């Protein structure tokens, strides 16, 4: 049937409303802006400028412009732009980001109602105008796109229909911000080179309060999201500058916002202790199956065309018969050549299909890169790229889902090829959710392995972050800006910066001056202190990342036996269900069934499934009793002897324990420092909770607490405790009733940090005999200790805090110290300590802790406070902890300390003094403390750093020369080895020939057989 006959058939049309519908795919506004940057990157642009031009007459008050220096578009390319869904980039081997032929339209229409595009390529200048305002005012339902073209040299129209050209330019002058031909040509002149593209978006979308969605005024170097609070939001969510910095995994294009360069990042080069892992899987088949299906359709179509051409050639050859005229031979040869060409194409398509089918069976290989973000530890999670373009960011996987400190601060980076996972149209997610979840699961497993490999938890997580300046317990607080912390962070992660000319990435050696001053924005290779990388012609060195291996824990014999038993039981249940099924072979068998079976409606679940046993949570919660408050002396004496309450007892054992504690001791306690003899108790039998109360966690990374079993509890060995501490806090109980009871409390505590500590406060009245037994004068004097800033040694570590309560006993004063910055669940928030013991000492008071009233009272009784602190310092002078601070009132000790520090400083400078420093070591030894303070240490450090770098370079050159010598020696050895092997092989061949000449019946095929035969022959002669 001729194609002209199809003109009478109905056609699908694209309505004007689709422009708005298509734009709603971008829920994330920065994703729409990124679509326009993607187009510039796919056009091989090396620079893109994003800027705003004020136009008060337009909706939003400004126009948003995107100008790049890419290859541009000719008129035919521009025509393809207005065809929704058509893209020349859609090839399996393509590394370009564009796939769907929809990004320019959907992205620009999400930002504003109208856009106009100016592009240059070769000798043509084309303009494309897509306007919803034009369609609304003209009442047009179809999508009409003016598309005029000019000659770039003469600026004359390039068209065969001047009437059409006039209508197109008239619409542009009427509905665009450029109302004359001169203004339109001015936009073309902004494209400075011979090629490039300028996209201008106007009539911007507004928020509910009438302001534009994009804020271009608050920060002249950035484009921000309006009406989004920056507190608690990642910077990439509200700052387009931050989002553009990590938009590509390997940036090769300079991005400017309002004329200011964006400092793009290679995430893999910004991490501490990076490590990569290789992951292979057969699960990623969706994209490969789609490609195989397409290749099969193409191969079948090509095969049909080839068969049809071959059949046509045979028919023509038979029809011609004996006709051997020249025209007949030419016609036959043309048909045969066409058939041969189509057959070759069909064979190529078939081979491509077979190759893709074979690739479908092969596993897909991905590379995960993990590292610690020591600059911003709260910016952690997985950054998932597709064809080098960011799709998902800050995805929490594996242990990070627990919201603890485990794997906190770790960033993962992966670039997923298009053939493994396909992104959605808005490039903010992946199309196949099932395979994406499988990817996240795999990344979680490798993340847990990485956390084990870097051994941060083994050396202490808090200690690790303290070393880099994270001194606050609040996880979201930034690190300290003190110089030594900044230097340490800079030393651990080498600086990787991009050249502004060649766009190559260079890793710089550590420079002390760069920590304070930073690097220039327009950095070039000639500024590199490394002489081997100080030219743009030098090759870009790849980052060397150590390779890690996922070590899966082998299953134990019990786990394998349990899994096998469950599988056998499952198969037995299936077999029983199959035996109960009666096959129906005829209509008579169906009539034999009971009426209720044939007429009963289908129910997916039996009724008994919805009738589970009643939860026993209410019973457990009701029976759980708290420890009553007691003021008896024996209990107070026991607490003085440091009975550490870290193991909470079951509810029904509380009364029994209290009865034992409240009994009078057999012998009175003579000294507080003596340890109390533990009262032996028989191991009780604890009834396990019902399954409805105790939840089962399937999380493989969560450390499961031991469940309360129906077996006797093993008696714990006796551990000596510190006699001067009485810890009031308890470790969080694993019982479900306590967890549910304190759910609201945990939610409130989560705001203070990453961890919460459940408190069970013991009132201060438990630590006193009675109110009548205390001396009022002593109590009044002791109450002045409140607010003192002290330090307590507990469980082998020192913690600082304030005295919040004071109790007076028999010649003993007890302080209740509330600690600060205690992030761990296993550590108490406060404790009672004995004043004057060796485990507590005074430190400098903190003015921030005292209230206004307390500060006024302190000023009134300043002399009494000084006397008390002096007495307390005398009592704590025998402390063995290294944290004890000296008495600041002793001038002699101060002079000795200063002299000692000056001597230490002199020794350090004398040892590290550079040879080229203007001050000699002899002059340095004659300096006093004031002269040492005025010494130019920064210049000294800089010269020392230069000398150290020269020394390292000399070592590097020596090592390189030795490596070259070793490589040359290895090459010579390999050459000799090859020559020896060739001689040996030639000798074997000659021996085999000689043996065959001597013995004609011999048949030796392999070299091993020849060696064995010769060995037997020699041994037999002997």
UniProtKB/Swiss-Prot annotation:
Listed under GO cellular component are: nucleus
Annotated GO biological process: double-strand break repair involved in meiotic recombination; gamete generation; homologous chromosome pairing at meiosis
Chain residues that bind Mg(2+): 39
- Does Protein biosynthesis show up as a keyword for this record? no
Found, by tissue, as follows: Protein is abundant in testes but not detected in other adult tissues examined (at protein level). Detected in germ cells with a distinct developmental-specific expression pattern but not in somatic cells such as Sertoli cells.
Residue numbers of Phosphothreonine PTMs? 827
CDD domains, per the entry: HATPase_MORC-like
Q: Which InterPro entries match?
A: Chromo_MORC2_6th, HATPase_C_sf, Morc_S5, Znf_CW
Question: Which residues does this entry mark as bearing N-acetylalanine?
Answer: 2
In chain numbering, cross-link Glycyl lysine isopeptide (Lys-Gly) (interchain with G-Cter in SUMO2) is at 649, 758, 922
List of residues binding ATP: 39, 87-89, 99-105, 427
- Phosphoserine: residues carrying this PTM: 615, 690, 724, 733, 737, 768, 770, 846, 851
Q: What happens when the gene is disrupted?
A: Knockouts are viable and appear to be grossly normal. Mutant males and females show meiotic arrest and sterility. Males have significantly smaller testes than control males. Their testes weigh approximately 70% less than control testes. Their spermatocytes and oocytes exhibit failures in chromosomal synapsis, blockades in meiotic recombination, and increased apoptosis. The ovaries of adult female mutant mice are much smaller than those from heterozygous littermates and are devoid of oocytes.
Q: Which SUPFAM superfamilies match?
A: ATPase domain of HSP90 chaperone/DNA topoisomerase II/histidine kinase
**Has the keyword Oxidoreductase been applied to this entry?**
no
Q: Which residues form a coiled coil?
A: 285-362, 555-583, 962-1001
Residue intervals of every CW-type zinc finger in the record: 490-544
| MF (Gene Ontology) | ATP binding; ATP hydrolysis activity; zinc ion binding
Give the residue spans that cross the bilayer: none
List the catalysed reactions.
ATP + H2O = ADP + phosphate + H(+)
This chain's function reads:
Required for chromosomal synapsis and meiotic recombination in males and females.
Subunit structure and binding partners: Interacts with Morc2a.
What protein does this entry describe? ATPase MORC2B
Q: Which organism is it from?
A: Mus musculus
């Amino acid at each position: 049937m001729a194609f002209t006959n199809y003109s009478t058939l109905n056609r699908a049309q694209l309505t004007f409303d689709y422009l708005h519908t298509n734009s709603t795919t971008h829920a994330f506004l920065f994703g729409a802006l990124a679509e326009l940057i993607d187009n510039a990157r796919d056009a091989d642009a090396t620079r893109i400028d994003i800027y705003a031009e004020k136009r008060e007459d337009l909706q939003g008050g400004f126009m948003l412009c995107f100008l790049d220096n890419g290859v541009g578009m000719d008129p035919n390319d521009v025509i393809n732009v207005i065809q929704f869904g058509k893209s020349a980039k859609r090839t399996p081997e393509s590394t370009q980001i564009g796939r769907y032929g929809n990004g320019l339209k959907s992205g620009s229409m999400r930002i504003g109602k109208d856009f106009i595009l100016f592009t240059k390529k070769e000798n043509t200048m084309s303009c494309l105008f897509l306007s919803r305002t034009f369609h609304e005012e003209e009442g047009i339902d179809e999508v009409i796109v003016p598309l005029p073209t000019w000659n770039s040299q003469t600026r004359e129209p390039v068209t065969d229909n001047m009437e059409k050209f006039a209508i197109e330019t008239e619409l542009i002058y009427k509905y665009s911000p450029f109302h004359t031909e001169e203004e339109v040509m001015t936009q073309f002149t902004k494209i400075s080179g011979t090629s490039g593209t300028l996209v201008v978006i106007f009539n911007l979308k507004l928020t509910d309060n009438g302001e534009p969605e994009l804020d271009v005024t608050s920060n002249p170097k950035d484009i921000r999201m309006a009406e989004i609070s920056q507190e608690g939001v990642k910077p990439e969510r509200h700052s387009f500058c931050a989002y553009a910095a990590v938009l590509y995994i390997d940036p090769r294009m300079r991005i400017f916002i309002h004329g200011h360069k964006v400092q793009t990042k290679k995430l893999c080069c910004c991490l501490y202790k990076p490590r990569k892992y290789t992951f292979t899987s057969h699960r990623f088949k969706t994209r490969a199956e789609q490609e195989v299906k397409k290749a099969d359709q193409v191969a079948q179509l090509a095969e049909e065309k080839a068969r049809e051409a071959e059949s046509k050639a045979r028919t023509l050859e038979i029809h011609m018969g004996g006709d051997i005229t020249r025209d007949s031979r030419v016609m036959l040869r043309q048909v045969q050549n066409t058939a041969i060409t189509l057959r070759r194409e069909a064979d190529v398509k078939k081979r491509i299909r077979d190759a893709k089918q074979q690739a479908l069976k092969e596993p897909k290989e991905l590379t995960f890169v993990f590292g610690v973000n020591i600059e911003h530890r709260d910016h952690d999670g997985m950054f998932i790229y597709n064809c080098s373009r960011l799709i998902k960011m800050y995805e929490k996987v594996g242990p990070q889902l627990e919201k603890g400190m485990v794997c906190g601060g770790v960033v993962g980076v992966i670039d997923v090829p298009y053939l493994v996972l396909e992104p959605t149209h808005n490039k903010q997610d992946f199309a196949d959710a099932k395979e994406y979840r499988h990817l996240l699961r795999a990344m979680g497993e490798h993340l847990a392995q990485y956390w084990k490999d870097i051994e941060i938890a083994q050396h202490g997580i808090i200690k690790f972050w303290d070393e880099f300046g994270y001194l606050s317990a609040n996880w979201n607080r930034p690190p300290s800006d003190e110089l030594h912390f900044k230097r340490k962070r800079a030393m651990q992660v080498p600086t990787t910066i991009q050249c502004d000319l060649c766009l190559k990435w260079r890793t710089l050696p550590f420079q002390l001056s760069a920590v304070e001053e930073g690097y220039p924005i327009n950095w070039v290779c000639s500024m590199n202190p490394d002489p081997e990388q100080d030219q743009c012609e030098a090759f870009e060195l790849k980052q060397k990342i150590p390779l890690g291996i996922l070590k899966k824990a082998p299953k134990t014999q019990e786990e394998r036996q349990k899994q096998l038993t469950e599988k056998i039981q499952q198969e037995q249940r299936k077999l029983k269900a199959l035996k109960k099924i009666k096959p129906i072979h005829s209509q008579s068998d169906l009539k034999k069934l009971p009426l209720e079976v044939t007429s009963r409606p289908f129910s997916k679940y039996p009724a008994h499934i919805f009738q589970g046993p009643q939860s026993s949570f209410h019973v457990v919660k009701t029976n759980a009793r708290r420890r009553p408050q007691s003021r008896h002396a024996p209990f107070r004496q026991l607490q003085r002897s440091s009975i550490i309450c870290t193991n909470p007892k079951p509810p029904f054992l509380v009364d029994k324990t209290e009865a034992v504690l409240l009994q009078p001791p057999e012998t009175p306690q003579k000294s507080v420092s003596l340890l109390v003899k533990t009262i032996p108790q028989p191991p009780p039998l604890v009834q396990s909770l019902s399954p409805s109360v105790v939840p089962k966690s399937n999380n493989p990374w969560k450390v499961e607490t031991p469940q309360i079993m129906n077996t006797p509890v093993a008696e714990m060995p006796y551990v000596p405790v510190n006699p001067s501490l009485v810890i009031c806090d308890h470790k969080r109980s694993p019982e479900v009733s306590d967890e549910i009871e304190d759910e609201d409390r945990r939610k409130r505590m989560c705001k203070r940090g990453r961890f919460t500590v459940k408190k069970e406060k013991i009132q201060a009245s438990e630590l006193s005999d009675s109110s009548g037994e205390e001396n009022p004068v002593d109590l009044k004097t002791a109450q002045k200790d409140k607010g003192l800033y002290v330090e307590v040694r507990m469980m082998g570590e020192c913690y600082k805090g304030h005295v919040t309560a004071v109790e007076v006993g028999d010649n003993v004063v007890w302080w209740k110290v509330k600690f600060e910055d205690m992030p761990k669940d296993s550590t108490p928030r406060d404790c009672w300590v004995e004043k004057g013991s060796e485990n507590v000492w005074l430190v400098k008071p903190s003015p921030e802790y005292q209230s206004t009233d307390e500060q006024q009272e302190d000023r009134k009784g300043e002399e009494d406070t000084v006397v008390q602190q002096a007495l307390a310092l005398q009592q704590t002078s025998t402390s063995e902890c290294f944290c004890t601070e000296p008495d600041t009132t002793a001038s002699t000790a101060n002079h000795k300390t200063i002299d000692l520090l000056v001597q230490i400083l002199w020794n350090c400078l004398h040892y590290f003094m550079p040879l080229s420093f203007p001050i000699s070591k002899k002059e340095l030894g004659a300096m006093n403390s004031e002269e040492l303070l005025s010494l130019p240490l920064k210049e000294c450090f800089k010269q020392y750093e230069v000398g150290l770098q020269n020394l390292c370079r000399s070592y590097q050159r020596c090592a390189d020369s030795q490596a070259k010598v070793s490589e040359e020696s290895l090459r010579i050895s390999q050459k000799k080895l090859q020559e020896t092997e060739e001689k040996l092989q030639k000798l074997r061949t000659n021996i085999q020939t000689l043996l065959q000449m001597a013995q004609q019946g011999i048949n030796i095929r392999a070299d091993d057989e020849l060696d064995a035969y010769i060995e037997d022959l020699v041994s037999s002669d002997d």
